Amino acid sequence: MAQPHFLLVTFPAQGHVNPSLRFARRLIKTTGARVTFATCLSVIHRSMIPNHNNVENLSFLTFSDGFDDGVISNTDDVQNRLVHFERNGDKALSDFIEANQNGDSPVSCLIYTILPNWVPKVARRFHLPSVHLWIQPAFAFDIYYNYSTGNNSVFEFPNLPSLEIRDLPSFLSPSNTNKAAQAVYQELMDFLKEESNPKILVNTFDSLEPEFLTAIPNIEMVAVGPLLPAEIFTGSESGKDLSRDHQSSSYTLWLDSKTESSVIYVSFGTMVELSKKQIEELARALIEGGRPFLWVITDKLNREAKIEGEEETEIEKIAGFRHELEEVGMIVSWCSQIEVLRHRAIGCFLTHCGWSSSLESLVLGVPVVAFPMWSDQPANAKLLEEIWKTGVRVRENSEGLVERGEIMRCLEAVMEAKSVELRENAEKWKRLATEAGREGGSSDKNVEAFVKSLF
């Protein structure tokens, strides 16, 4: 069989780029395939693809989405970006496929993440197979798929646990105002229903979601995760994907000075902004709780999910509390999350439950306080608290605010009352995740079988 050539297309956001690149590397390493990674110029300009230039069989195809600096200011910008993303992406992919048709390595298959749902149309024009790379858990896919069938009046879906409204991905919630995002997911599900033998690649592992990977009878889900840096499965600290030494010395030295499992790590990722009221409640909870913490707070304005009417950065929002906060813990604008989570001093991860962060908590065996914000995060929080039992989830008040007392309750539960149970469960998932993700593990085998099934 000739060397397969995959054209992998992803949206230019860090949460899409990272797992997609890691899948590309797994695909190359396990099968010897060639991968062309296609995305927008902003990914290159914002240095979102470090340390991949020397990967054999991996090349890049970039095109403009009209926002090459990556700065998105308002809702209109988002819509304009998506229009240019599709128009320019369609042309770039088509030109690339045509240029390689008669060469040594013609494109064999297109792989795409959520948002470039136009990729299958390109594949069909050239009579090529296309496969979706789902970068959220299988559980979230099951919810979206069942919802798309019109079975959404009561949240009781076949082969899934009972769901409350608070467990749904935010784009399916009755209070959702982002109809464009909901339409994107509906479009993907509708396309998959048209396929004769639909197959999707999922950033999960077999032992983590066995029932959810088989919950939809007519769709084959292939577990290819956890899509995290390879070094995380070996315990190596040499990989450049794990740390930036020149930036990490201050917080690593601070962590080194703390006792084992005593520090709360707080991070809400790069996409979502906390309201001023919410950040004040969180700050007060950390101050009054008195436990050492490491809190990542960005000083950037260009969040994907910005709070309307609030112009301050998050770091500006805590200005009035900063002195009190720094008497108890440490505030940084960036850290290597994996480096932090694997540190012996970390006892708890207060997380927004983004899927990459959720996987990292599992692979590194760290219990969590689940503080979901949007997208798939509420579903992920349900998994962490109720299914895998590695964390405690916060509850909002009637106004949608998580009060300081509730935050303190959850932190104390994870650090004290339920710490033994949660840590035992976390260690179990750490072992299973490492077995799946290491070289030659179940996910490597699944990737090999996937490629063989295509050709």
From Swiss-Prot:
Matches recorded under Gene3D superfamilies: Glycogen Phosphorylase B
Source organism, top-level taxon: Eukaryota
Protein name: UDP-glycosyltransferase 75B2
GO molecular function (one): indole-3-acetate beta-glucosyltransferase activity
Database matches in PANTHER family: GLUCOSYL/GLUCURONOSYL TRANSFERASES, UDP-GLYCOSYLTRANSFERASE 75B2
Binding positions for an anthocyanidin per the UniProt entry: 16
GO CC terms of this entry: Golgi apparatus
InterPro entries: UDP_glucos_trans (IPR002213), UDP_glycos_trans_CS (IPR035595)
Enzyme Commission number(s) of this protein: 2.4.1.-, 2.4.1.121
Species this chain originates from: Arabidopsis thaliana (Mouse-ear cress)
Chain positions recorded as UDP-alpha-D-glucose binding sites: 337, 352, 355, 357, 360, 376-377
Matching Pfam families: UDPGT
Pathway annotation: Plant hormone metabolism; auxin conjugation
Gene of this entry: UGT75B2
